[in-house]
């Protein structure tokens, strides 16, 4: 289904290190696809990208599969899961936007995170409260559109579910999810 690009500017050693899994799953009733399983290699590359502000490696995560992903999601509006604004300002880029802009699909960063919280540092119960800290800035832009929610790592699903709840209020034609990686942890169950 997917092929390897050979004419890219990313180190071939780094590309070989990435082992795509193409994990299909559901978030509620919505189809989702994760390209990689979240493992030590992905964790290390994400740290280099986000933590060390290495924007030059933004393309490494998706470059091998751009053609196929563009075909799969043609006509979708890409809505990235947000970072806290101040974190983006320190980094001088939004890592999710930079990671997915290689797809050259319409990007609509309409979600904002209103408080600096790191999901990884929170308990499962606290993670479910993420909806208190996400807002949608424009409800009309997504009405009747095919929406692709994108993120770097899908762990428990709390953030994605909160984003879906906001996007559903816009009455989109369709919602799908694409994440660069998925943690092997189970999703939080609806209570």
Give the predicted meaning of each segment.
Residues 2-6, 19:
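Short functional micro-motifs and their immediate structural scaffolds
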Residues 80, 109, 149, 177-179:
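Structural beta-sheet core signal
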Residues 10-77, 84-93, 101, 112-141, ...:
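Active-site-facing substrate-recognition patch
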Residues 67, 98-105, 161, 165, ...:
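Short, well-ordered alpha-helices that flank and scaffold nucleotide-derived cofactor binding pockets
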Residues 105-109, 191:
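Active-site regions of enzymes building and remodeling cell-envelope glycoconjugates
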Residues 149-163:
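A phosphate-binding catalytic loop at a beta-strand-loop-alpha-helix junction
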């Amino acid at each position: 289904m997917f092929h390897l690009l050979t004419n890219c500017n990313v180190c071939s050693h780094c590309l070989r290190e990435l082992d795509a899994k193409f994990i299909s799953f559901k978030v509620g009733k919505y189809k989702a696809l994760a390209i990689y399983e979240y493992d030590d290699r992905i964790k290390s590359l994400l740290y280099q990208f986000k933590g060390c502000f290495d924007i030059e490696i933004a393309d490494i995560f998706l470059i091998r599969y751009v053609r196929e992903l563009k075909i799969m999601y043609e006509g979708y509006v890409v809505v990235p899961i947000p970072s806290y604004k101040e974190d983006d300002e320190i980094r001088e880029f939004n890592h999710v936007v930079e990671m997915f802009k290689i797809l050259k699909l319409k990007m609509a960063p309409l979600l904002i995170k209103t408080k600096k919280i790191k999901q990884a540092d929170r308990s499962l119960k606290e993670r479910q409260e993420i909806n208190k800290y996400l807002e949608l800035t424009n409800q009309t832009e997504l009405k009747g559109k095919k929406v692709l929610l994108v993120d770097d790592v899908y762990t428990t699903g709390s953030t994605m579910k909160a984003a879906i709840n906001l996007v559903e209020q816009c009455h989109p034609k369709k919602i799908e999810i694409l994440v660069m990686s998925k943690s092997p942890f189970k999703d939080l169950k609806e209570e």
